[in-house]
C-alpha cells in the first residue's frame, strides 16, 4: 500500500487574465485573496468565531459560533458537548445575534423561547430561563495535524519549496495554460499525473474567511477520489 502525503492551502476565489499564458494571477484578485487569510485585517470576528464548551449546572453544554458577515453571528447550542465530543446529534438550539458592538455580541432565540447569550473575548455566557453557564472557546486539532511524511511516502505537494511537478498542466476554457499555484499554495482543480489504487492519503487544508457567503458560496476544500465524488 502506498502512503501519499500532501498538504494543501486552497485559495478558491482567484481569477486570471487571458492575455498571459504564464502562471500569474490578476493583481486585484491577489490582494483580495490574501485578505481572506490575513488574521490581522479580519480582527476580532475571527477571534470570536469558533467552538465553545462549558457546563449548564451539572450538564455539559457546547456551542459553535459562526460569523455571518456584517459583524453578525449565529450560535448553534449543542446539548452534551461538541460533535464527536459529547453531542449525540440530537438536541440543539440556534441563537441569532445583533451586530458586534464594542467587542460584545448579544444573541437571542428566533423562537422567543427566552434563551439568550452574550459573547466577548472572555467567552460565551448562555442563559436559558433560570439556567446560566459560561462557555470557553476551545481549539480542537486533529491528532495527525502537521504529520511528517513517513519513510517511503510519495510527497505530492508540500515542504519548504512546494511545486506542481506531480500534477498535470491545467488549461483554461480558451485552451491556454492556467495558473496552478498562487503565493506558494495550490489552486483548485489540480490532477495528479500518477494513478493510485491502494493507498493511505494525508492531506491538510486551509480555507479563506468568507462569512458573508451563506450558505454554499463559502470556501471549502476536498479531493475527488477516482476523479469523482
Feature-to-residue mapping (PLM):
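Bacterial N-terminal signal peptides
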Residues: 6-15
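Generic detector of short alpha-helix boundary/capping microenvironments
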Residues: 10, 38-41, 147-148, 191
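Carbohydrate-interacting regions of secretory-pathway proteins
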Residues: 27-28, 82-229
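Boundary at the C-terminal end of the N-terminal hydrophobic targeting segment
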Residues: 20-24
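Positively charged n-region of N-terminal signal peptides that target proteins for export
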Residues: 1-4
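Central antiparallel beta-sheet cores of small beta-barrel/beta-sandwich binding domains
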Residues: 26-119
Amino acid at each position: 500500500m502506498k502512503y501519499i502525503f500532501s498538504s494543501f492551502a486552497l485559495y478558491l476565489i482567484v481569477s486570471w487574465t487571458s492575455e498571459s499564458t504564464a502562471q500569474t494571477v490578476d493583481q486585484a484578485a491577489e490582494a483580495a485573496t490574501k485578505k481572506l487569510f490575513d488574521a490581522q485585517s479580519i480582527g476580532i470576528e475571527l477571534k470570536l468565531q469558533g467552538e465553545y464548551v462549558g457546563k449548564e449546572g451539572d450538564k455539559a453544554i457546547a456551542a459553535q459560533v459562526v460569523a455571518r458577515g456584517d459583524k453578525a453571528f449565529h450560535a448553534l447550542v449543542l446539548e452534551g458537548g461538541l460533535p464527536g465530543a459529547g453531542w449525540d446529534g440530537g438536541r440543539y438550539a440556534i441563537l441569532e445575534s445583533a451586530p458586534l458592538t464594542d467587542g460584545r455580541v448579544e444573541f437571542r432565540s428566533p423562537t422567543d423561547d427566552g434563551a439568550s447569550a452574550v459573547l466577548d473575548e472572555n467567552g460565551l455566557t448562555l442563559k436559558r430561563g433560570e439556567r446560566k453557564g459560561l462557555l470557553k472557546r476551545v481549539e480542537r486539532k486533529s491528532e495527525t495535524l502537521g504529520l511528517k511524511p513517513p519513510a517511503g511516502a510519495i510527497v505530492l505537494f508540500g515542504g519548504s519549496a512546494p511545486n506542481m511537478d506531480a500534477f498535470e498542466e491545467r488549461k483554461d476554457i480558451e485552451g491556454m495554460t492556467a495558473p496552478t499555484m498562487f503565493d506558494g499554495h495550490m489552486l483548485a482543480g489540480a490532477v495528479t499525473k500518477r494513478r493510485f489504487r491502494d493507498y493511505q492519503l494525508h492531506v491538510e487544508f486551509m480555507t479563506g474567511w468568507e462569512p458573508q457567503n451563506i450558505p454554499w458560496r463559502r470556501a471549502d476544500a476536498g479531493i475527488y477520489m477516482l476523479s469523482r465524488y
